[in-house]
């Protein structure tokens, strides 16, 4: 039997396992995507003919019952004085003269993973890692370099993988547990209301066939159960990997929560999270996501993974009350934490804006992040 293949990008691997520091909205919005692309192209246009840009790299790591594929694209692979250089380009609005070797550990980590994979592929004893910082406003450029042995890179890489493996095993254990409960789960009422079964069949077929289903029915006809029950069954059959229940009304959101509670009472195991608007769940007088002002933003990334493990091991329904409880216990932003939880939940209940707004915080999940 072929092992399950689990994929993760090099950047996401590094940012999840090694993240440290604080939430700072000033940094998040500092460079727009288009500016970043232009900055990358500007640096890459200066490469020599023997240098290569946007080089795809991947490494498969086999475990007992799954294979982890780590993949990404190195911004540049350069050659200088018979030495190979992995170039990682980072665009910024910060004065590059203020950037030193300790500026961002994650930048080095990402480049080191590329360097390990390439060194292994080409059987290199050592390789140079270069971080190229490019200011999109004043076009200042700074190059930082470190040389690593293959042994150093291999040790770093497998330490990273071991830390991530713990999360994979936690998630695999949950999915097996969840799917066993879905397989034995039947419609939670003795009989269907008029039209309920027909709607449930339509919804299931729409999911499995990748089609759309538009339905209209009066209040009280059991629409929510007719939608969630087949969606959960499709989840257990691996026809989908996440259910989004989107609504503009708090009352409709609560109906979805109550429906999931009924299903859990009948033996279903399912993780669900409610995404509450930042304005409603922020604990501060002013909505300023900067570490100097907000204690829940300050050091957030130092503590969030510990809080995640606590939640995932002991709870299935993540409502605002529970999220606030962990927010106080671990001193983390409740809004950002709810977004973190959505990555691990089977059902995400949220406002329309989180799906359809181009700037929405859940876009990463929808794009397979």
Show the residue positions of the predicted features.
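Conserved pre-motif I regulatory segment
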Residues: 174-216
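Short, conserved "post-DEAD/DEAH" coupling segment immediately C-terminal to helicase motif II
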Residues: 360-368
